[in-house]
């Protein structure tokens, strides 16, 4: 980037103030924002004169608006990409104090304000992006909930504050991309609020709406009751995206540490899953043991029942044989009563036999179920042993990774110390070099003085020689 100071020999207070203001403010219409990999580059379109110009320059407004749209789109790309990467590395729910998230909302606010028509009120002209956002509930019914919530917030007094609250609630709802796409597709409604060459009316708005889909992977939580959204100043912090020349020194070490931390988090997550699986299997084993105990008790009861039925059947057989024998020996008049008793005994015997068959069938079923449960318990025990072995191996790997992490951290600290020492040595060498350069200049000046004196002496000698002759 070229220097912004005016080429004047004697600065005046007016030019100093203008220079300071220009150094503190970056106008999107005078610079082109481009992306160099993952970094932001600001390239000056033309030389900016910092002295007051009595005749204003006449530039093409369409060109300036197109340049602003391109700059805002590139800023949105960087902001969204940086927010997603930092949120995933952080691995937790984001809140309103998170700096990349604050910058994302600032960039979105600038995108929504670009090319916004000014509405005339009693207090003057007012530009607010709350009007277009209110249209979303007519296009997407799900947005009516957050619009009503924004209107019910007691601390919001200005349309700008309501628009900022709406953006935060839409991000929490993970519907911001859907709402923006629905709004951009209705150009006939947006034309009431935006100029024809505004960002929301051009292709850049659709690109930004597509980029917002990636934000659905992050979780955000905002408490807007105590937050002052009306008086916040939406200034883009370019320092978060400008590349530092010294930032690439520890890239390799940081990448290794990041990879190790990712592996550590993966192993810990796998360990938690395995512990949960082991707990579930242990609960199943306990339940099967209780069921096995219950089945054993039921089997003992069934065996006792079978023994009782066998004894009763033997007794009935003896009684029936005794009755038959007595019928053969007794008089005929008693045979009718004895026949009835015999039929009742046979009926009772048949019922007892059927009951015995049912009990034996149930016993066989209980035995088969017990065998199946024993087989399932053996398989579960084998699975638990395998899981425990895998868990021990993973814990060993985790310990190794932790040791490697400490070793890399120590090496990184040592390398940082070496870099610091080298930088100090380099600064001392530069200081000595500067001193030697100053000494050389003094010697050269002395040499020049001596040459001049020699020339003077030669000329004086030449003048004296003819006089002697």
Curated annotation (Swiss-Prot):
Gene Ontology biological process: actin filament organization; cell differentiation; negative regulation of axonogenesis; nervous system development; positive regulation of axon extension; positive regulation of cell migration; positive regulation of intracellular protein transport; positive regulation of retrograde axon cargo transport
Entry's Gene Ontology cellular component terms: anchoring junction; axon; cytoplasm; cytosol; dendrite; endolysosome; filopodium; growth cone
Positions carrying Phosphothreonine: 5, 12, 51
Tissue localization of expression: Overexpressed in gastric cancer cells and tissues (at protein level).
Boundaries of every RUN domain copy: 95-227
PROSITE patterns: RUN
PTM statement from Swiss-Prot or TrEMBL: Phosphorylated by PAK1. Isoform 1 is partially phosphorylated.
Primary localisation category: cytoplasm
InterPro entries registered for this protein in UniProt: RUFY1-3, Run_dom, Run_dom_sf, RUN_RUFY3
Coiled-coil segments on the chain, per record: 271-362, 422-463
Gene3D superfamilies: 1.20.5.170, 1.20.58.900
Recorded superkingdom: Eukaryota
Function: ARL8 effector that promotes the coupling of endolysosomes to dynein-dynactin for retrograde transport along microtubules. Acts by binding both GTP-bound ARL8 and dynein-dynactin. In nonneuronal cells, promotes concentration of endolysosomes in the juxtanuclear area. In hippocampal neurons, drives retrograde transport of endolysosomes from the axon to the soma. Plays a role in the generation of neuronal polarity formation and axon growth. Implicated in the formation of a single axon by developing neurons.
Domain comment, as recorded: The second coiled coil domain is involved in the interaction with GTP-bound ARL8B.
Quaternary structure, from the entry: Interacts with PAK1. Interacts (via C-terminus) with Ras-related Rab-5 proteins. Interacts (via C-terminus) with Ras-related Rap-2 proteins. Interacts with PIK3CA and PIK3R1. Interacts (via N-terminus) with FSCN1; this interaction induces neuron axon development. Interacts with DBN1. Interacts (via the second coiled coil) with GTP-, but not GDP-bound ARL8A and ARL8B. Interacts with dynactin/DCTN1 and the dynein intermediate chain DYNC1I1/2. Directly interacts with DYNC1LI1.
Protein's name according to its UniProt entry: Protein RUFY3
Gene responsible for this protein: RUFY3
């Amino acid at each position: 980037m070229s220097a912004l100071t005016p080429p004047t020999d004697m600065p005046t207070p007016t030019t100093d103030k203008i220079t300071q203001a220009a150094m503190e403010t970056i106008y999107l219409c005078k610079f082109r924002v481009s992306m160099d990999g993952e970094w932001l580059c600001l390239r000056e379109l033309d030389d900016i004169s910092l002295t007051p110009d009595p005749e204003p320059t006449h530039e093409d407004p369409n060109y300036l608006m197109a340049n602003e749209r391109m700059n805002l789109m590139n800023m949105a790309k960087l902001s969204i990409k940086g927010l997603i990467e930092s949120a995933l590395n952080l691995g937790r729910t984001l809140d309103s104090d998170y700096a990349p998230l604050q910058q994302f909302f600032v960039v979105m606010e600038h995108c929504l304000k670009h090319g916004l028509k000014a509405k005339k009120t009693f207090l003057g002209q007012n530009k607010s992006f709350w009007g277009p956002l209110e249209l979303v509930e007519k296009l997407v019914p799900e947005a009516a909930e957050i619009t009503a919530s924004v209107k019910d917030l007691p601390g919001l007094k200005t349309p700008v504050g309501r628009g900022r609250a709406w953006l935060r609630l839409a991000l929490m709802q993970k519907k911001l991309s859907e709402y923006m796409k629905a709004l951009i597709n209705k150009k006939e409604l947006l034309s009431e609020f935006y100029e024809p060459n505004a960002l929301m009316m051009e292709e850049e708005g659709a690109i930004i709406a597509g980029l917002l889909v990636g934000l659905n992977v992050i979780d955000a939580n905002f408490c807007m009751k105590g937050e002052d959204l009306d008086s916040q100043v939406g200034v883009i912090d370019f320092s978060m995206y400008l590349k530092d020349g010294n930032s690439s020194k520890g890239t390799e070490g940081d990448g290794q540490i990041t990879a190790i931390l990712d592996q550590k988090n993966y192993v810990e997550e796998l360990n938690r899953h395995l512990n949960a699986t082991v707990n579930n299997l242990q609960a199943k084993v306990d339940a099967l043991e209780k069921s096995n105990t219950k089945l054993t008790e039921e089997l003992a009861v069934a065996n006792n029942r079978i023994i009782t039925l066998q004894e009763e059947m033997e007794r009935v057989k003896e009684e029936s044989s005794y009755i038959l024998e007595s019928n053969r020996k007794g008089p005929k008049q008693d045979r009718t009563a004895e026949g009835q008793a015999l039929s009742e005994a046979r009926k009772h015997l048949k019922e007892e036999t059927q009951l015995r068959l049912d009990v034996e069938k149930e016993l066989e079923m209980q035995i088969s179920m017990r065998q199946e449960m024993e087989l399932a318990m053996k398989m579960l025990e084998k699975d638990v042993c395998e899981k425990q072995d895998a868990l021990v191996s993973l814990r060993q790997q985790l310990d190794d990774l932790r040791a490697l992490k400490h070793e890399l951290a120590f090496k990184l600290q040592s390398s940082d110390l070496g870099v610091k020492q080298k930088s100090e040595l380099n600064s001392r060498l530069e200081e000595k070099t500067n001193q030697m350069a100053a000494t050389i200049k003094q010697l050269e000046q002395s040499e020049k003085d001596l040459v001049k004196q020699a020339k003077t002496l030669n000329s004086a000698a030449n003048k004296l020689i003819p006089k002697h002759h």
